Amino acid sequence: LGLEVHPTGNDYKEIRQYSLSDKANGKSYRISVKREQLGAPGKVSNYLHDSVNVGDEVRLYAPAGDFFFVDRQTPTVLISAGVGITPMQGMLETLADNNHNQPVHFLHACEGSEQHSFSQRTSELVKQNNWQQNIWYRNEEAEQAHISNGMMDLASVDLPTEKGNFYLCGPIGFMQFAKQQLLKLGVGESNIHYEVFGPHASL
């Protein structure tokens, strides 16, 4: 979804693209914006958090892109890292709403519990639909059985490598890392789908 705003004190308008984080309902769009504070603070993300309120109007541009969920009634594996969880949340909501009758695996990696967006909601969806969930925290130990410490290890998970469709989203280095693991496990390249934040490129 394209969003255009004119941050206070800025000479020019700014346009940002955001992934949708909820299922389509024909009435509204939901985006989930992380406040960027470290390094060069996010101009638009901070403006949205600090200055935009319910009832304010912003200019939107229709969603577009080549990364979307195709309900093929095959096993589905969603693999994300960091803010790459955003479109995966929308896909999980869609799968639940459509009563997807094939196995679903949700795999996510992040720094720790404080950076784990949507954790409560995804756990609810996984439990309600009898799906599988595996999480990796790089800098935190956790007591839950489905959460591991360290780097994501796809070989440690029982995945539908022959028939599944795999969706990747996150930093490009992470997606390259995940894709190489999938290829080594025997997943066909045509069954690996991904989104790069920026101009589309091959992994």
What is each model feature region?
Residues 85-97:
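Histidine-anchored nucleotide/phosphate-binding helix
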Residues 24, 63, 87, 171-172:
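Proline-centered helix-kink/hinge sites
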Residues 14-29, 70-83, 185:
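Short, compositionally biased
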Residues 1-57, 96, 110-112, 123, ...:
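Ferredoxin-reductase
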Residues 74, 94-104:
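Conserved S-adenosyl-L-methionine
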Residues 103-203:
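Reductase modules of NAD(P)H-dependent flavoproteins
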Residues 61-73:
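A short, basic/flexible loop-to-alpha-helix module at the beginning of a structural domain
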